[in-house]
Amino acid sequence: MASQLRLRSALALVTGAGSGIGRAISVRLAAEGAAVAACDLDGAAAQDTVRLLGSPGSEDGAPRGKHAAFQADVSQGPAARRLLEEVQACFSRPPSVVVSCAGITRDEFLLHMSEEDWDRVIAVNLKGTFLVTQAAAQALVSSGGRGSIINISSIIGKVGNIGQTNYASSKAGVIGLTQTAARELGRHGIRCNSVLPGFIATPMTQKMPEKVKDKVTAMIPLGHMGDPEDVADVVAFLASEDSGYITGASVEVSGGLFM
């Protein structure tokens, strides 16, 4: 989908921006004209993402803003709150678009999964999304600003998957969190939606055995795995006023998998 500069006045915070879907989202939002605050646990990876971004709204060659990289472990409350403070200090305003894309997997069968692996996936994928959503919403409400919060869940959060009890639970929780936030924050002019990617070609899915990839691909009606840019297209739509009457939605980007 071609960019349309729908976000020329927006400041977008993207967590998990150092690679994969988060990086593609950062690139797409910048192409739409947004200033991007790219955050990752790996600060160097976030800086690499920023180097890929053009000047916000610079179709005529005149820079109208800047992008910046941030490092944070969003699973920690003080770090998540400090991230929002640092973004506001850098850009002199809170982000009007917030995309929580930070996520991890630690796969194991239910019978053998350690409590540590359960806790860590829940901490990053669900608690981290809660902490960023809360801090961003608090900043927006305090400033009186409108906003769009977009949380990256997964189709696995809807249907489950063998060996991923922790991941599926965390992503199901993101859907519930987002729907509840939509109910609570709508009166403040803040829209909240979740995006449910299917099997997308990312560093995370590259770890899958080829036999598993082939089996999954055969189940997808469109016949192929998605690209990170497919998810970024949907996020750009949800970030823009083109989706101004959409909140509480869970948008699947799965090629029809599990429909």
UniProtKB/Swiss-Prot annotation:
Organism: Mus musculus
Gene assigned in the entry: Hsd17b8
Assembly information from the UniProt record: Heterotetramer with CBR4; contains two molecules of HSD17B8 and CBR4.
Any one biological process term the GO annotation gives: estrogen biosynthetic process
Pathway: Lipid metabolism; fatty acid biosynthesis; Steroid biosynthesis; estrogen biosynthesis; Lipid metabolism; mitochondrial fatty acid beta-oxidation
Residues carrying Phosphoserine: S58
Localisation per UniProt entry: Mitochondrion matrix
Top EC class of this enzyme: oxidoreductase
Record's protein name: (3R)-3-hydroxyacyl-CoA dehydrogenase
SMART domains in UniProt: PKS_KR
Record's catalysed reaction(s): a (3R)-3-hydroxyacyl-CoA + NAD(+) = a 3-oxoacyl-CoA + NADH + H(+); 17beta-estradiol + NAD(+) = estrone + NADH + H(+); testosterone + NAD(+) = androst-4-ene-3,17-dione + NADH + H(+); 17beta-hydroxy-5alpha-androstan-3-one + NAD(+) = 5alpha-androstan-3,17-dione + NADH + H(+)
Primary localization: mitochondrion
GO annotations of cellular component type: membrane; mitochondrial envelope; mitochondrial matrix; mitochondrion; oxidoreductase complex; plasma membrane
Summary of the tissues where the protein is detected: Kidney, liver, testis, ovary and spleen. Oviduct, uterus, mammary gland, vagina, prostate, clitoral gland and moderately heart, dorsal skin, brain and lung.
Family affiliation: Belongs to the short-chain dehydrogenases/reductases (SDR) family.
Role noted for this protein: Required for the solubility and assembly of the heterotetramer 3-ketoacyl-[acyl carrier protein] (ACP) reductase functional complex (KAR or KAR1) that forms part of the mitochondrial fatty acid synthase (mtFAS). Alpha-subunit of the KAR complex, acts as scaffold protein, required for the stability of carbonyl reductase type-4 (CBR4, beta-subunit of the KAR complex) and for its 3-ketoacyl-ACP reductase activity, thereby participating in mitochondrial fatty acid biosynthesis.
Assigned EC number: 1.1.1.n12, 1.1.1.62, 1.1.1.239
Gene3D superfamilies: NAD(P)-binding Rossmann-like Domain
GO molecular function: (3R)-hydroxyacyl-CoA dehydrogenase (NAD+) activity; estradiol 17-beta-dehydrogenase [NAD(P)+] activity; NADH binding; testosterone dehydrogenase (NAD+) activity
The entry's keywords: Acetylation, Fatty acid biosynthesis, Fatty acid metabolism, Lipid biosynthesis, Lipid metabolism, Mitochondrion, NAD, Oxidoreductase, Phosphoprotein, Steroid biosynthesis
